[in-house]
């Protein structure tokens, strides 16, 4: 996608320094566009935990390179396994991270230690390229849903969509998951409008999704997190579409905190609730998401403080709660499959159920 007319991926290896990677510092959006250089496993881990890089597919791709960096001086099995465990622990909820590391470890253990760094770069590059192709396919399948809504409306007015958090191109290597169909619909000439949940406490909707959509020229409106139900109740939402950090084998969906409340409101108002995801986000080893998906607890400061621009246009942080008030900060919640209209994957759409997922991924029936 583009920033100021220039095409970027959210992660790349510069041609003149192929032993490092570049990412955007997502904690600086939208006020500043800053590029970070990462060239060692510690820097990669810090970027993931600090959320300078975020989004389930993207952190998996970044971690893949981090594993290669860790092997520069010692490519033994012991070093490989130690680095893999270190990286997997950085964000416990997003399954793409574990998926990417497990894929890398399997590939690297198949070659001699002296060949692992070179083979690792090839595999990490492949993960990135595949992510772009997968997300483009998700976009095409989701676009069909938006077309259907537009046609049902007699091609009158606009298609109103609601999204939560950020599942756009900066959350993946390119295109995004939940936003990919929206970009394609807009580019096709379908008049879409997006209600953008602010997504407290880190405001990834108001800061990141709104910035992405605005940069692409997509009409949108930022709303308070608690306003979504009202807009659904008053007939101003045609479809909810979100991304996810982990989907279980029976279709439960872990996503940014607050997603479950949107699903409840959508269910109560007969608004379709769709989840867009690459197959790398499916955890075939877990069935009950509420019981078995670990939920990351982040710093209370993310709830107690807020960052924004002051009247002079300077970025700053202010406390928004009393000095003696504690805060809790679960980063994710789980939406039960019964509240999900369907899943949009690179292979097509399906019901949020074990049967639905296996209809698209029959090879997993035998594997698990």
Curated annotation (Swiss-Prot):
It is an enzyme of class 5 (isomerase). The keyword Amino-acid biosynthesis applies. SUPFAM superfamilies: NagB/RpiA/CoA transferase-like. InterPro entries: IF-2B-related, IF-M1Pi, IF_2B-like_C, Initiation_fac_2B_a/b/d, M1Pi_N, NagB/RpiA_transferase-like. Its EC number is 5.3.1.23. One of its GO terms (molecular function) is S-methyl-5-thioribose-1-phosphate isomerase activity. Catalyzes the interconversion of methylthioribose-1-phosphate (MTR-1-P) into methylthioribulose-1-phosphate (MTRu-1-P). HAMAP family: Salvage_MtnA (MF_01678). This is Methylthioribose-1-phosphate isomerase. It comes from Gluconobacter oxydans (strain 621H). The lineage of its organism: Bacteria, Pseudomonadati, Pseudomonadota, Alphaproteobacteria, Acetobacterales. The gene is mtnA.
């Amino acid at each position: 996608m583009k920033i100021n007319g220039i095409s970027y991926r959210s992660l790349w290896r510069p041609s003149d320094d192929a032993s490092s990677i570049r990412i955007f510092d997502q904690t600086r959006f939208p006020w500043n566009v800053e590029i970070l250089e990462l060239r060692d496993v510690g820097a990669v881990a810090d970027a993931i935990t600090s959320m300078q890089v975020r989004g389930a597919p993207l952190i998996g791709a970044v971690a893949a390179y981090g594993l290669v960096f860790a092997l520069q001086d010692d490519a033994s099995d012991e070093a490989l396994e130690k680095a893999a465990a270190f990286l997997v622990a950085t964000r416990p909820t997003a399954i793409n991270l574990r998926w990417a590391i497990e894929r890398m470890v399997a590939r690297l253990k198949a070659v001699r230690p002296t060949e692992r760094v070179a083979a690792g770069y090839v595999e990490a590059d492949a993960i990135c390229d595949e992510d772009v192709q997968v997300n483009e396919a998700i976009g095409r399948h989701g676009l069909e849903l938006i077309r259907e809504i537009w046609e049902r409306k007699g091609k009158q007015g606009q298609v109103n969509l609601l999204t939560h958090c950020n599942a756009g191109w900066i959350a993946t290597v390119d295109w995004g998951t939940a936003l990919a169909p929206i970009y394609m619909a807009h580019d096709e000439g379908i008049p879409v409008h997006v209600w953008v949940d602010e997504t407290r406490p880190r405001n990834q909707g108001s800061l990141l999704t709104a910035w992405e959509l605005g940069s692409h020229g997509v009409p949108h409106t930022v709303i308070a997190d608690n306003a979504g139900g009202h807009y659904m109740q008053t007939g101003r939402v045609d479809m909810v579409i979100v991304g996810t950090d982990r989907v279980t084998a029976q279709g439960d969906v872990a996503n940014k905190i607050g997603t479950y409340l949107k699903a409840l409101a959508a269910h109560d108002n007969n608004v379709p609730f769709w989840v867009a995801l690459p197959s790398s986000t499916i955890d075939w080893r877990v069935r009950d998401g509420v019981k078995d998906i670990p939920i990351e607890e982040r710093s209370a400061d993310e709830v107690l403080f807020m960052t924004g621009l002051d009247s002079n246009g300077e970025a700053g942080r202010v406390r928004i709660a009393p000095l003696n008030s504690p805060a809790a900060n679960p980063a994710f919640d789980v939406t039960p499959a019964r509240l999900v209209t369907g899943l949009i994957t690179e292979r097509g759409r399906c019901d949020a159920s074990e049967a639905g997922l296996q209809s698209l991924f029959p090879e997993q029936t035998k594997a698990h």
